């Protein structure tokens, strides 16, 4: 079985797949310790043979995780490295090593799935948008705060905005009428900012390609903007798809 890891800014997503890419087990944790516990439980049902990982964390954190996986599970990790070109996509950054590896994996996966021009949107802790031409040229993209960061900034940098963000998660209720409480006002305002950003990316993609492009949507908050992009393909595991392309397992 193959252990796959997506180590993002806030969470570590993990899953166990078989040789046919069928997902046997998966989860989301906040720390290496929680990951070890989850994999210990998964190991009772599945025998691990390989591990591949994409991470946006520091070199020290990656080295620590690789060491833990080797010592605890006997796994040698195949990790994504920066590249100027991969699977037909040419990295659009002036310094290709500076493009976040999670974005790179999403771009590579989307291009493989579309085989043409595509707009790639990932709504997580940060929100990213990337543009790829039909010939695989990555035009670059945009990064802005995601919903968790928008909430946090308002709570930390204003004196009188205090509310339970967990309890407020459902306060939009599909409505974007002006909020009648601080929590409603913040939640609806932040979601509207995300939706406006996404709409602007759609218009830019149309300027580039007319209607000849596909849209890929991923990330934990993708559902908040899906109706803004009725043509979008929602692919929750887009980064894992890219990971499989970047780090194939020898047969």
From Swiss-Prot:
- Is-annotated flag, keyword Magnesium? no
UniProt: substrate binding residues: 93, 100-103, 182
The entry's K(+)-binding residues are 122
Q: Where in the cell is it found?
A: Cytoplasm
Query: Listed disulfide bonds for this chain?
Result: none
Q: Which UniProt keywords apply?
A: ATP-binding, Coenzyme A biosynthesis, Cytoplasm, Kinase, Metal-binding, Nucleotide-binding, Potassium, Transferase
Describe the function of this protein. Catalyzes the phosphorylation of pantothenate (Pan), the first step in CoA biosynthesis.
Its protein name is Type III pantothenate kinase
In its UniProt entry, the species of origin is given as Azotobacter vinelandii (strain DJ / ATCC BAA-1303)
**Phylogenetic lineage:** Bacteria, Pseudomonadati, Pseudomonadota, Gammaproteobacteria, Pseudomonadales
């Amino acid at each position: 079985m193959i252990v796959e890891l997506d180590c993002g800014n806030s969470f570590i997503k993990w899953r166990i797949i078989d040789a046919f890419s069928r997902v046997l087990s998966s989860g989301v944790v906040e720390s290496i310790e929680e990951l070890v516990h989850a994999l210990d439980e998964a190991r009772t049902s599945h025998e691990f043979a390989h591990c591949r990982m994409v991470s946006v964390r520091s070199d020290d954190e990656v080295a620590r995780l690789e060491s833990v996986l080797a010592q605890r599970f006997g796994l040698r990790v195949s990790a994504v490295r920066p590249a100027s070109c991969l699977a037909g996509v040419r990295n659009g950054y002036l310094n290709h090593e500076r493009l976040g590896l999670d974005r790179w994996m999403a771009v590579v996966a989307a291009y493989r799935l579309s085989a043409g021009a595509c707009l790639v949107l990932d709504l997580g802790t940060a929100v990213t948008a990337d543009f790829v031409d039909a010939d695989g040229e990555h035009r670059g993209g945009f990064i802005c705060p995601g919903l968790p960061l928008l909430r946090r900034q308002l709570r930390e940098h204003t004196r009188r905005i205090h509310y339970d963000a967990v309890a407020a998660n459902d306060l939009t209720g599909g409505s974007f009428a002006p909020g009648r409480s601080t929590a409603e006002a913040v939640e609806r305002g932040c979601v509207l900012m995300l939706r406006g950003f996404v709409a602007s990316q759609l218009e830019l993609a149309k300027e580039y390609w007319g209607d000849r492009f596909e849209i890929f949507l991923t990330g934990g908050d993708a559902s908040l903007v899906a109706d803004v992009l009725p043509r979008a393909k929602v692919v929750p595991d887009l980064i894992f798809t890219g990971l499989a392309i970047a780090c194939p397992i020898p047969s």
